[in-house]
Amino acid sequence: MRLQLVALLFALVFNAFSHEHSHEHHHEGDGSEILTKVGWNDHSEELHDHHEHDHDHHDEQLIRKNHTSHREIQHSRLSTLKVWVFSLSAVVGISLAPCTLLFFIPAQHANGPFLKILLAFGAGGLLGDALLHIIPHSLSPHDHSHDHHDHNHSHKEHDHSHDHSNQLRVGTFVIAGILVFMMVEQLVRIIKGGHCHSHENGHIVADEHRHLNEHDHEHSEEKKQQVEGLKDVKASAYLNLVADFVHNVTDGLAIGASFSAGNTLGWITTLTVLLHELPHEVGDFAILVQSGFSKYQAIRLQAVTALGAITGCVFSLLVSNPGSLNNDADTSAIMPFTAGGFIYIATVSVVPELLESGDHNNLSKVAKMAQSLVHVLAICMGVGMMYIVSLVE
């Protein structure tokens, strides 16, 4: 009995000692966890401080980025203003330069020999512009259709089909330009057929009819043909003004798009258009004077057609992607249609006038042959000028 009590007491004491020891270990564990938590909190504070530092640094980067973006916007506005100023200045300069040159050309009678040479030069310029510049430029393949030309055979066939369809489209619009200009001229002749003179060349036709009454009857038919010839050429002069205006629109589109791509390209395009316009404007001036306009009337009309270049330039600068507009303008109906008009004016209106010029003067056969040779050389000079411009471009 005593042994059982002693064993029970010993068990109680040992159990109490074990509980106290485990309790101490438990509290020591809690303390280590507290220390661990305290250490972790210290590390968290460091991370928080580092996060605040990163946040401040991020704010500083945002401020700097906003400042840079603001400077880029200001620079972009200045660049846009520069493009507008350069483009419009180039267009105005190209328009004024030929008109200034025209003042130094001596005024002559419609059948003057020097004016006939200018007329032949203008015919060559029209043919060269249409056949050596406008049509080849419209037929040339564009970069976007040949960027991946070597990928596979089917893509090559697609490019070939695209080029063929483009050639057909350009040829169709050239023919359309010729037919439309012919129909317009026929319409003008029909409208003017019942009148002896129009509003613009009334004095010229009236003077010619006055001379008909003064000359002998044997010369009346020849004079009547000359009067009708003046009326016919007048219609072609208006057609030439329309074609020149449309052509100037395409020049303005090219200049605006070039300056949008870069100043260097813009000035190169400006020089090319200027070299192209100088002989072109001289020929147009000769056609207008030959049609019955006075020298200063012809210069004013040439200045009016220059508004087409300004219109095209402004439109090119207003669009979002001028470069693509320039490519679309080159392959659209505008340029080949204008080329057809130039071909019609040169071959139907100007060249026949040159062929008939020797029939109305009292020159020997040798002198007429020499005059025809000079006209051919003037046509070749006009074509040659456009050939050089095409090479430079």
Curated annotation (Swiss-Prot):
Membrane topology category: Multi-pass membrane protein
Membrane spanning stretches: 85-105, 117-137, 171-191, 255-275, 303-323, 332-352, 372-392
Membrane in keyword set: yes
Subcellular location per the Swiss-Prot or TrEMBL entry: Membrane
Main location: membrane
A molecular function GO annotation: zinc ion transmembrane transporter activity
Recorded phenotype for the gene knockout or disruption: Reduced brood size, but the majority of hermaphrodites are sterile and lay a large number of unfertilized oocytes. Defective spermatid activation. Double knockout with spe-4 results in failed spermatocyte division. Double knockout with spe-6 results in suppression of the premature spermatid activation phenotype of the single spe-6 (hc163) mutant.
Keyword terms, alphabetized: Differentiation, Glycoprotein, Ion transport, Membrane, Spermatogenesis, Transmembrane, Transmembrane helix, Transport, Zinc, Zinc transport
InterPro entries, per the entry: ZIP (IPR003689)
GO cellular component: membrane
Expression triggers: By cholesterol.
Membership in a protein family: Belongs to the ZIP transporter (TC 2.A.5) family. KE4/Catsup subfamily.
UniProt-recorded name of the protein: Zinc transporter zipt-7.1
Organism whose genome encodes this protein: Caenorhabditis elegans
